[in-house]
Design a protein with these regions (language model features):
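Amphipathic alpha-helical "stem/stalk" segments
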Residues: 1-140
Length: 140
């Protein structure tokens, strides 16, 4: 329940929104804007979210949390954060040779996709979720 309380706080939503609205053109641009040396605040914000969701995934994997309850409580957060950060996390794994980096986060994201689909919902997160994308460019 402590995880839910933290992830339902106003501060969580401020942090989640800030993370989801970060933009970059490529990995160099990302690192220039948000890398730990250049922007320690963004680094701390990102790691706080990533490691929390990684922990949720590890708890589910160890059968200490129930997948459907996690989905009901924070499934949207998991899906949107993974959609935003997947490529960066995979790049970090490859660039720094740490293949298991945040595997709990990836695990729980995959489980949230399965749970969405089992309920008959789409699991895709639209690119326009946290920024305006005109309809002619694929927005809603």
């Amino acid at each position: 329940m402590q995880i839910y309380q933290e992830m339902s706080s106003p501060e969580h939503y401020i942090r989640a929104n800030e993370l989801l609205t970060m933009e970059w053109d490529d990995f160099d641009d990302y690192y220039r804007k948000y890398g730990s040396e250049n922007n320690p605040e963004a680094y701390a914000l990102r790691c706080s979210m990533w490691y929390r969701l990684n922990g949720v995934g590890l708890l589910v994997k160890a059968d200490l949390l129930d997948v459907d309850r996690v989905y009901d409580l924070i499934g949207g957060t998991i899906l949107s954060q993974w959609a935003k950060w997947r490529d960066i996390i995979i790049w970090i794994r490859e660039e720094w040779s740490i293949p298991g980096y945040l595997e709990g986060f990836e695990f729980i994201a995959d489980e949230m996709v399965k749970e969405s689909e089992s309920r008959g919902y789409a699991a895709d997160v639209p690119e326009s979720l946290h920024r305006y994308v005109p309809k002619e460019k694929g927005g809603t």
